[in-house]
Amino acid sequence: MVLIRVLANLLILQLSYAQKSSELVVGGDECNINEHRFLVLVYTDGIQCGGTLINKEWMLTAAHCDGKKMKLQFGLHSKNVPNKDKQTRVPKKKYFFPCSKNFTKWDKDIMLIRLNHPVNNSTHIAPLSLPSKPPSQDTVCNIMGWGTISPTKEIYPDVPHCANINIVDHAVCRAFYPGLLEKSKTLCAGILEGGKDICQGDSGGPLICNGQIQGIVSVGGNPCAEPRVPAIYTKVFDHLDWIKSIIAGNTAATCPL
């Protein structure tokens, strides 16, 4: 059974989108405190997601992480003992991929957020670069988040966990997710032997390849980290023109073909 897992208590957001849920990193280790300056902890209507700072005023997360009350925390490592330079913001404006008013779990799971106030770069806060080109198959990439570290139990860590996974042939994901379109604007990534994966609590977080954000956590298997069940990530490169247009002030930007 496949589900889109929104973090924390697996609460169901009452949105115009479809039913959703989130993910967390299984099989990883504690992230280095100085190597995730772009990572955002998102609290939305009592549910947890991840996100990525892409410049001092803008961030990316998954569309299914949307909610009426969103709190965005930057510069965080330990949730119990926050860094002194932690900063908190709320959305000033949220933008969704505008080809369709309806959310689908295979496409359009991307949300661009303009912050109510720019964040200040600091020891633990700095943006991550947008992609210059898409990742190739077998590229080693990094996942991270405060999601559950158990594939079957809700065990949420105090600090984010990181793991390395690979870009996988899209055909592998289509075999497990029969609704996935052949030309879907997504990436398939994971470890085919199993053991490392996103899980509950990681939705919206980054897939980082060669120092750039290439994916946004969208859909995974249940339980997490099963063999031959990679996860699906929104492909940031395929949304790059839209992202840049919105940031430049063209809020009527349409989807690329």
From Swiss-Prot:
Its main location: secreted. GO terms for biological process: proteolysis. The keyword Secreted applies. The keyword Metal-binding does not apply. One of its GO terms (cellular component) is extracellular region. One of its GO terms (molecular function) is toxin activity. Pfam families: Trypsin (PF00089). Snake venom serine protease that may act in the hemostasis system of the prey. This is Snake venom serine protease KN9. It comes from Trimeresurus stejnegeri (Chinese green tree viper). It is found in: Secreted. Residues 19-24 form a propeptide. Expressed by the venom gland. SUPFAM superfamilies: Trypsin-like serine proteases. Residues 1-18 form the signal peptide. The active site is at H64, D109, S203.
